Amino acid sequence: MARVLVLYYSSYGHIEKMAEAIAEGARGAGAQVDIKRVPETVPEEIAKKANFKLDQQAPIATVADLEQYDAIVVGTGTRYGRISSQMAAFLDQTGGLWMRGALNGKVGAAFASTATQHGGQETTLFSIITNLMHLGMIIVGLPYSHQGMMNMTEIVGGAPYGATTIAAGDGSRQPSAIDLEGARHQGELVAKTAAKLFG
């Protein structure tokens, strides 16, 4: 049974919901799945004033956790078209894993959230994928077998590089049914790929 980690950072809960959907898809494909988040770097008082979602249930990950998994799916909200500082700070600590080749050949994937439709979804996915490729991971995206990406009747997230959602500038838009379907589909593909590689 493949072991999958869904590792995320979420300020307002949008990525948390996407992480849960990815985990659901991976479990549905027979994987053992853990959801963990990276540490918050914003001081608690400031985070409260900014209305960050501080009651997230996922445990905090450590860098040492990563090598226990066959697949790691990394998600974060976008900051100016790139990875959040919280996720970057966590991934920047993986140098020891890189030196030992501890993640070489494992499965990696990315998911993201932006405030607007053109707010840097693909560049954020690429900034995650770049880290994963430097760690030697095999990347699984979100292919067009997810029919929701072809939807032209509403604004939807999703790219061939990974599942995404759009939060709106004030955070009022929650992941849509199509966004969550894409996340589940990507989770399923990650789990199936890891199972083929690791049994």
From Swiss-Prot:
InterPro entries: Flavodoxin/NO_synth, Flavoprotein-like_sf, Flavoprotein_WrbA-like, FMN_Rdtase-like_dom, NQO. It is an enzyme of class 1 (oxidoreductase). It catalyses: a quinone + NADH + H(+) = a quinol + NAD(+); a quinone + NADPH + H(+) = a quinol + NADP(+). GO terms for molecular function: flavin adenine dinucleotide binding; FMN binding; NAD binding; NADH:ubiquinone reductase (non-electrogenic) activity; NADP binding; NADPH dehydrogenase (quinone) activity. This is NAD(P)H dehydrogenase (quinone). It comes from Paraburkholderia phymatum (strain DSM 17167 / CIP 108236 / LMG 21445 / STM815). NAD(+) binds at residue 12. Belongs to the WrbA family. Substrate binds at residue 98. One of its GO terms (cellular component) is membrane. PANTHER family: FLAVODOXIN-RELATED PROTEIN WRBA-RELATED, FLAVOPROTEIN-LIKE PROTEIN YCP4-RELATED. FMN binds at residues 10-15, 78-80, 113-119, 134.
